[in-house]
């Protein structure tokens, strides 16, 4: 089975590719010559994932899945949420996003947060959603050099290491994206 993962983010692609069973040939957007930036115009994480999956299916004809992820901080009423990637501006700068979030949390005691990933699968024109959530808290400063996005400041519940301190295999077992992806794989194996 050929399946396109609708992302231009090489870190996301690498993270998911490591989890794909051998009977699925995972293709990237560049593999199908999709070089355009698919605009995320949805008001929710679910909508953004669906927009990307629908775009690839409708324009390229491939079965496809797409994800969108948001970091939801309790004391910020769920922000940055759907705007996580461009929290500090449209440039999608991880460092600037982290700095802005840490600044906003400086005088707050409640640092609880969760990552939420929604994967939209468009298979033969039918769409299904798979959700993964990882609860944790925002650290006061960055730790670790692995991962991407908010990984250096996210400490998952029950762990002493940030996502950026974990090996990819360890992170994938507990991460929001790993949880959603395992749901997707379970669905595809039926």
Swiss-Prot record:
Residues that hold substrate according to the record = 7-12, 69, 148-151, 171, 176-177
Enzyme Commission number: 3.6.1.66
Catalytic residues per the record?
68 (proton acceptor)
Keyword line: Hydrolase, Magnesium, Metal-binding, Nucleotide metabolism, Nucleotide-binding
Q: Which coenzymes or cofactors are required?
A: Mg(2+)
- NCBIfam families the record matches: PRK14823.1, RdgB/HAM1 family non-canonical purine NTP pyrophosphatase
Function summary: Pyrophosphatase that catalyzes the hydrolysis of nucleoside triphosphates to their monophosphate derivatives, with a high preference for the non-canonical purine nucleotides XTP (xanthosine triphosphate), dITP (deoxyinosine triphosphate) and ITP. Seems to function as a house-cleaning enzyme that removes non-canonical purine nucleotides from the nucleotide pool, thus preventing their incorporation into DNA/RNA and avoiding chromosomal lesions.
Name assigned to this protein: dITP/XTP pyrophosphatase
